[in-house]
């Protein structure tokens, strides 16, 4: 949600309030392993599920938004900040049948977006955009699940989590 406090034909400046959630996940199948400084090595069969990992970051945020127009060109920028971000992850080790879950609260979240475009017509616009986000590295709690034995162990202040990411894109926008 954006409230514009400066608005002119060629520029706008406003304050933002919102909520953002970002998720990442990946898995490892097959491959080679090396533990204990190379003393224990081996191979997993191709296609065998080994590890699955998921991260979720959520944050209510405050921010600034701006737009500047020069003839058919425009530049749009946003900056978001939150001291209340929360990170969660799940680390699944399939072969050992164990799961680690971590939760970190009160992380700092920063995000910046810049979008540069050219208006081909009043409805059509081509643009390029870059966004960058950072969630600070902070300490949180971890829970260990031995799924085969049914054991659960909770460990306070034993997990650390952070995230940096960026995207670069280009597109065509059509307004109805």
Task: State each model region's role.
Residues 1, 21-57, 82-113, 135-171:
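Extracellular/periplasm-exposed beta-strand and loop segments of Gram-negative cell-envelope proteins
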Residues 1-25:
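Internal, hydrophobic cores of structured domains that mediate oligomerization or house catalytic pockets
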Residues 2-6, 19, 66-70, 116-120, ...:
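Residue-level signature of outer-membrane beta-barrel architecture
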Residues 10, 72-75, 122-128:
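Repeated loop/turn-to-beta-strand initiation elements of outer-membrane beta-barrel proteins
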Residues 15-23, 30, 66, 77-83, ...:
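Transmembrane beta-barrel strands of outer-membrane/channel proteins
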Residues 57-60, 68:
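Short, surface-exposed binding/anchoring microloops in extracellular/periplasmic proteins
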């Amino acid at each position: 949600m954006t409230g514009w406090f400066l608005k002119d034909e060629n520029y706008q400046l406003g304050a933002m309030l919102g909520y953002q959630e970002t998720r990442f996940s990946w898995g490892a199948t097959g491959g080679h392993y090396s533990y204990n400084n190379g003393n224990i090595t081996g191979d997993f069969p191709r296609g065998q599920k080994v590890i699955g990992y998921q991260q979720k970051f959520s944050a209510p945020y405050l921010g600034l938004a701006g737009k500047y127009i020069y003839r058919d060109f425009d530049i749009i920028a946003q900056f978001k900040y939150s001291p209340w971000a929360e990170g969660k992850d799940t680390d699944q080790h399939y072969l050992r049948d164990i799961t680690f879950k971590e939760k970190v609260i009160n992380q700092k979240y920063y995000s910046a977006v810049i979008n540069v475009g050219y208006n081909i017509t009043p409805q059509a616009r081509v643009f390029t955009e870059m966004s960058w986000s950072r969630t600070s590295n902070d300490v949180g709690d971890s829970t260990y699940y031995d799924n085969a034995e049914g054991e659960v162990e909770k460990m306070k202040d034993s997990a650390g989590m952070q995230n940096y990411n960026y995207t670069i894109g280009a597109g065509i926008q059509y307004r109805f």
